Amino acid sequence: MATSNNPRKFSEKIALHNQKQAEETAAFEEVMKDLSLTRAARLQLQKSQYLQLGPSRGQYYGGSLPNVNQIGSSSMDLSFQTPFQSSGLDTSRTTRHHGLVDRVYRERGRLGSPHRRPLSVDKHGRQADSCPYGTVYLSPPADTSWRRTNSDSALHQSTMTPTQAESFTGGPQDAHQKRVLLLTVPGMEETGSETDKTLSKQSWDSKKAGSRPKSCEVPGINIFPSADQENTAALIPATHNTGGSLPDLSTIHFPSPLPTPLDPEEPPFPALTSSGSTGSLAHLGVGGTGQGMNTPSSSPQRRPAVVSPLSLSTEARRQQAQQVPPTLSPLSPITQAVAMDALSLEQQLPYAFFTQAGSQQPPPQPQPPPPPPPVSQQQPPPPQVSVGLPQGGPLLPSASLTRGPQLPPLAVTVPSTLPQSPTESPGQPPMGIDVTSAPALQYRTGAGSPATQSPTSPVSNQGFSPGSSPQHTSTLGSVFGDAYYEQQMTARQANALSRQLEQFNMMENAISSSSLYNPGSTLNYSQAAMMGLSGSHGGLQDPQQLGYAGHGGIPNIILTVTGESPPSLSKELSSTLAGVSDVSFDSDHQFPLDELKIDPLTLDGLHMLNDPDMVLADPATEDTFRMDRL
């Protein structure tokens, strides 16, 4: 038994022993793991400590520039020397231990800088040390160079920068943080350029762009800092520059300022007299267009429009610029103004969109305009759904905008005769926009509309006269395009969108909306906006340039006639565009895009708009729809 039992006992003992060993080994491994982790953490700490230890000296080790700017350069030098000496000792020591490897590092260290080696030796990992050193070294030089640049522009910055560095004291971190501050400062600087002047100077962006915080007054200068900043800073200047096309970058905001100036002159705006309508249009950005659309005779009246000559001229210029250049380039207000007369020609494009008298009612427009009293003047013959949002108010001669919803071609005859028509010119007054959406090419002159549209009107309509079509497209683009985009890049986007949209026949409605813009019709901005007239649209495009002026964009409304979209569609589109342009124009504040939060139109939205049965009798209803659907 003993012999037999012995092996068993031994085997058991062995098993127990093995088990214990395994357990111990596992425990040992765990401990080792913990140790290694701790060591790694310690190394990390050391590295960070090293970086932070010499933020002053570490930062400037590699950079001579930092030393130049540094007040405590002497201390820096001392630190340098110390590392030097220690580095010599360390090097010898390291060489003993590490031999060849250390030699290589030593060589490198000599080439680069002794400071590294001491650090690396202390850390027991040259590579690790060199890494932190490298970061420190790299960041300080960049930082210093930056500081130097800033210091050149602003002496006090160097003083400020050291302070910042001290506060941040963190090697590379310090530099980065400084930069961050600088970046942030510019924005603040624009907001309170005077107060933050010092800070802005500190900021490196601030220096170059922000160094002129005061010049922020000039919207153009503000552009550099940032779109948002520019808007904030430029807003005030923008008000002054409402007439100018350049400041329009912040057009979205400018329009509101402009409308205010225009309103006083546009009080007749409600009157819708040609001048009044011009004023209102200008105010809405439609006026300019309206004038542009009006026959040549109307264009002169347009100028007289109550709207300040500036606003009119801006509109006119804008119209012209838009009409003439297919690109919808916003011509300088002056050019547009000059074009105003030419606009009659240019208007032909718009005219194409709006049959002047004939536009009154292209036969296709079956529905008599609802009773927009002023608007309906001409329109009665062709039944049209007056889109007059607030028809009642001269402000909203949407009635003038009336377009037969059923008409696929959005025939909108805005009786230029409205108050405008008298001023406009006989015969021409019924410049109702008759947009034969379907026949984008042939613009319906409408029975009533003699060539008054403009000789080119039919052709221009078909051709979407270069100026008009791009403009219109741009208008459409703005409609479909983000209203917000329009605000910021309205003009450019509008152009691009307009081109794209032009390609889409679905844009007809936009055309119709533009056609809705009746030069004669005193499409007040609100009307245009409510109608979503492309004119208002065009205004959006140009709002930047003429947003305040009244958009003069109406010419932009120039049809992109894809005559298929029914008036209702164009109505929706117009309203959408109007909403967008509303953002730009205070006149239509009632439907500001921002408030409506209107998104760019989608194909579904277009179809919805295209629905001929979708007739919104009431302007308010229309607006609601617009808000709900869009």
UniProtKB/Swiss-Prot annotation:
Domain of life: Eukaryota
Biased composition (Basic and acidic residues): 194-208
Keywords: Activator, Biological rhythms, Cytoplasm, Nucleus, Phosphoprotein, Transcription, Transcription regulation
Motif segment (Nuclear export signal): 242-258
Region (Disordered): 142-174, 187-221, 256-331, 356-475
Pfam families: TORC_C (PF12886), TORC_M (PF12885), TORC_N (PF12884)
Listed Polar residues bias regions: 151-167, 292-301, 310-331, 414-426, 450-475
Tissue-wise expression: Highly expressed in developing cortical neurons, peaking during dendrite development.
Biased composition (Pro residues): 256-270, 361-384
Record localization: Cytoplasm; Nucleus
Residues under site feature: Required for ubiquitination and degradation: 571
UniProt GO molecular function: cAMP response element binding protein binding; transcription coactivator activity
GO CC terms of this entry: cytoplasm; dendrite; glutamatergic synapse; neuronal cell body; nucleus; postsynaptic density
Modified residues (Phosphoserine): 64, 113, 151
Biased composition (Low complexity): 385-394
GO-annotated biological processes: cellular response to cAMP; energy homeostasis; entrainment of circadian clock by photoperiod; memory; negative regulation of membrane hyperpolarization; positive regulation of CREB transcription factor activity; positive regulation of dendrite development; positive regulation of long-term synaptic potentiation
Post-translational modification remark: Phosphorylation/dephosphorylation states of Ser-151 are required for regulating transduction of CREB activity. TORCs are inactive when phosphorylated, and active when dephosphorylated at this site. This primary site of phosphorylation is mediated by SIKs (SIK1 and SIK2), is regulated by cAMP and calcium levels and is dependent on the phosphorylation of SIKs by LKB1.
Role according to the record: Transcriptional coactivator for CREB1 which activates transcription through both consensus and variant cAMP response element (CRE) sites. Acts as a coactivator, in the SIK/TORC signaling pathway, being active when dephosphorylated and acts independently of CREB1 'Ser-133' phosphorylation. Enhances the interaction of CREB1 with TAF4. Regulates the expression of specific CREB-activated genes such as the steroidogenic gene, StAR. Potent coactivator of PGC1alpha and inducer of mitochondrial biogenesis in muscle cells.
Entry similarity comment: Belongs to the TORC family.
Quaternary data: Binds, as a tetramer, through its N-terminal region, with the bZIP domain of CREB1. 'Arg-314' in the bZIP domain of CREB1 is essential for this interaction. Interaction, via its C-terminal, with TAF4, enhances recruitment of TAF4 to CREB1. Interacts with 14-3-3 proteins, including YWHAE/14-3-3 epsilon. Interacts with calmodulin-dependent catalytic subunit PPP3CA/calcineurin A.
Name of the featured protein: CREB-regulated transcription coactivator 1
Organism: Rattus norvegicus
